[in-house]
Amino acid sequence: MRFKGLDLNLLVALDALMTKRSVTAAARSINLSQPAMSAAIARLRTYFGDDLFTMRGRELIPTPRAIALAPAVRDALLHIQFSIISWDMFNPVQSERRFRIRLSDVMMLVFFERVVKRLAREAPGIGFELLPLTEDPDELLRYGDVDFVILPELFASSDHPKAKLLDDTLVCVGCPTNKQLKRQLSFENYGSMGHIAAKFGRTLKPSIENWLLLEHGLKRRIEVVVPGFSLIPPLLSGTDRIATMPLRLVEHFAKTTPLRVAELPLALPPFAQAVQWPSLHNRDQASIWMRQVLLQEALHMTAPRDSVEYRP
């Protein structure tokens, strides 16, 4: 089908090439033969008057023109998908929809476990692909590579809808044998003790606790860096190191792991965890239903603090 001289099928090919960066992989992803994909590239080059891609080894490298076209092409295809193709009534009981969700290990353990258990009973055909927060949320949402991103609201994109799920707060934790945590921590003690910290992604981006601590002038001597908060408690055992962690996760580990919990030398404000979805998914029936499930489960979460033993 042509629209003003452009074969619209070529947009599907261009999107696949930008995503896969390989002629073979792109052809396979949209059920084309490799010769057919090569022909599509030739036609795209003719229409746009640009090479669009060059080869570096086996990888396709997009030209500036291809990079500029990519977001508009992806937006157009997603708009067609969610406003025309997918506009069927969604029945969660019968659906086999698989939701792709990016979230931290914290929310995986303290929140999403509830969602998975509930839907195993109520909508057993629903599946999930749960992935770590390793990339820029803006990019993930813009290209529709995820159905949802669950992250601290401070880091949410301003270009896509969001909804608050729950509040959390930060506390200091250590091994029960850590004598320095038997008394109120001073700024000096907190800064001089060895810390274990979480950083995320390939570039080890600072986590929420690092952002809040720096924002309020609290500095740490970080001795160990791990790629997620859930790896911290076992590494505290038998050491005098401490860590700053979300209280809900501390509550989760306190059921099985001995921890000494202390107040930070400066009371930090609570922070919110939020869910975001691509703006083009806003009217998608499956997305709407899943949002409702997430918000309902968040409402059932009790406020943190009551179940953790603060040991003097």
Swiss-Prot record:
The lineage of its organism: Bacteria, Pseudomonadati, Pseudomonadota, Alphaproteobacteria, Hyphomicrobiales. This is Nodulation protein D 2. Keywords: DNA-binding, Nodulation, Plasmid, Repressor, Transcription, Transcription regulation. The gene is nodD2. CDD domains: PBP2_NodD. Belongs to the LysR transcriptional regulatory family. GO terms for molecular function: DNA binding; DNA-binding transcription factor activity. Residues 6-63 form the HTH lysR-type domain. Represses the expression of the nodABCIJ-nolO-noeI operon. Induction: By flavonoids. The keyword Glycoprotein does not apply. It comes from the Bacteria. SUPFAM superfamilies: Periplasmic binding protein-like II, Winged helix' DNA-binding domain. Residues 23-42 bind DNA. It comes from Sinorhizobium fredii (strain NBRC 101917 / NGR234). PROSITE patterns: HTH_LYSR.
